[in-house]
C-alpha cells in the first residue's frame, strides 16, 4: 500500500509539473464547451430570406412581417422577379426564397413556394420547416379569427376548416437548443481523451525513457503499476466532469433534470472504459507519438463520428450503425442524455450501463493479459 | 548448481528475428566478484543483462541468479537484484530526493534504512537534492542512478554501461565506488565498452557480436598475448600506419592513441630482433627520421583486437 501511495504521488508530480499536460487537462473542457456553445452551433439563426410577392395583399404582408420578425430569419430583399432570386442564390446572399402566388389572400389554400439553398441539406431542411411552421401558424390563427367572426353572426355561411392541424410540443428541449445535444457529446469526448490518451501516453513514456525497465525489475506487482498509472487520471476526469456540468449549467443554461449522483456514477463507469482502452493502447504502442496517434485515430474519430454526437446514428448505413455499437461513447451519450436532459432514473438506462460494464470487464482482462511483465 | 556461483549461464541463445544477439553464452560468476562484460556496441551485453534481470526470455539455455531460475523464479529475482539500465532511467521531472524516495518505497524500504550503503555516493549529490534529476550533470546522474539501484541493498548489482557518457574523472571515481561496494559483499556485474576499465574488474569476459571470446582475469587475458608488441611513433602518424601495414613482416597494426601497436609474424625471440632491425631500415628507407620503436606490455584492448573471431 505504501508502494502504491508513493507511486500515486509520483504520478501527480509528473502531471502537475508538466505545463502542457496541465493545459490539456484544465483548459480543454472549457475551450470545448465554449467552442461548441458559441462558435460551432447547428442552430438556425438570422438566415437571409428574399420574398417574391406576386399578390401584395394584406395576407402576404403579414406573413412577410412575421418571417422578418422571427429570430431565425432576416428579410434580405423583396424581389420583383424570379430571376433576381436566382441571382441572389448564386451569389450566396440568401438561403431561402418565398414565392407567393397572385391573389394569395382570396384563395384559402393557395400554395406558397419555398426555395432553399440545399448545399447544406440539414440546414435546408430546418430552414424550410421553420418557414413552413410560421406560415401554417399564421394560417391557423386566421382560420380561428374567421371562425370567431362567423360564430358571432349566426346563420353566416362561414366554412369550418376540415383540415387537421397538428399541435407540436417539443419534449425535453422545448427551445431546441444545440447545447442539450453537444454537452453529453463533449463529456464523452473529454473523458475519452483524458483517460485513454493520457494514460496510454503516461505508460508509454515510462517505456520510452527506460524507467519501465527499472520498475519491472522491482518487487512491485505489474497490476499496481497499472493501477497507479490510471488512478490519477480517473480523479482528474472527475474534476473535468464537474467543470463541464457547471459550465453547461451556468453558462449554457442546460438543466440537470435527473440525479447528479447517477450522472457522475455513469461518468465514472465510462471513464473506466476509457482508462482500460488507454491501457490496451499502451501495451501496443512503444513510443509516445504512436500512442497519441492510435488514441486519436482509434478513439477520437469514432467518438466524434460514430457516437451520435455529430451525426444521427439512425441515418447511417447499417454497417456503420452496427459498428457504432462498439463505440463506448455512443452508450455513454445515450445514458447521459436520458439522465441529464430527460431526467430519467437508473432503471431507464440499465442497458447502457450493462454494455459499458461489460466493456470494462473485457478490456481489463485483455489489457492485464497483454501487459508485459517482461520487455517483449 | 554450484553454490559459490551467484550467476550461472549455460548455453544461452537469443535471436531478434534474424539477428543473433547471443550465441551459446556460458559463464559462471562467483559470489562477491566484480565481473566485467567488455565489448563494443552490438556485442550483446545489454541483451545478456536483460536476460539475467528477467526482462527477456532466452531462446534456449539456462540461466540462474542467486540459485534462482531467471524464467521460473523471476519474481524472487526481482526482489533481490539491483539494476541500472544503460539509459539514464530516472524521472527527469522529479528531484534527486524524490527519485531516491520513490525507488526506496517501490522496493519496500526507506532511505534511512540503508543509508549507510549509499552514503559515500549519495553524500556527493546530497547538496543538490532539491534539483530536478534532468538538470544534473552526467556524473551526478550516474551517482543518483547508482544510489537508486542500491537503495534496497541488493545481493547482485547489474550495471549496464554505467560509465558511458561520463567524464574521465567521474569514471575513475565510479570504479572506486564499485570497489567499496564489492567490499560490502555485493556481487557486481558491470558492462563497459571502455577497454581501459577492464583492469578494474576481478574477471572479465570479452564479447563481440553475441559471442563470448574469452573469460579470465585481466592479467590472465593479457598473458595469453603471445606475440611481441611494439609501440611505434613518428611525427606523421597516418602515413606511418599505412607504411607499417605494408611492411612484409607485419602481422597486425592498429592506431592506439599516440602510438601504433604493431605485432610481427615472427614469433620466436631469436627471429624477432632481426625483424625489428629490418623494420628500422625499412622505415629509414621510407624517409622517416624520428621513428621510435619500443616493446610494450599488451593491454586488454590489444588482446581484444588479437581475438578476431575466426571467420
Tell me what each language-model feature is:
Chain B
Residues 7, 14-207, 214:
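ABC transporter nucleotide-binding domains
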